Amino acid sequence: MVHHMSIFDNQTIESLRQQIRTIPNFPIEGIMFRDITPLLNSGKYLNKVTDMFVTICNHNNWVPDAIVGPEARGFIFGPLLAAKLGIGFIPIRKP
């Protein structure tokens, strides 16, 4: 497992955390749903998190041929990352 947090400062991480709401017991009792809608509503933070994904790739010398993203959140972040890396995006849908 690669640890990524150490390459980002605490202030950056905390500013992103503040953009993610926690909704307890949704969709069922005992689940803590993480709502990323506030992050998506901000070009500043959406760009920052995408840049962080690029930094992680570069830091680990990852040179993917394409980004594969699962349905839902993968469809949001995958194409943004692929575009910044200059590669294609492959969407994967749930059965």
Protein language model regions, located:
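PRPP-associated nucleotide enzymes
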Residues: M1-P95
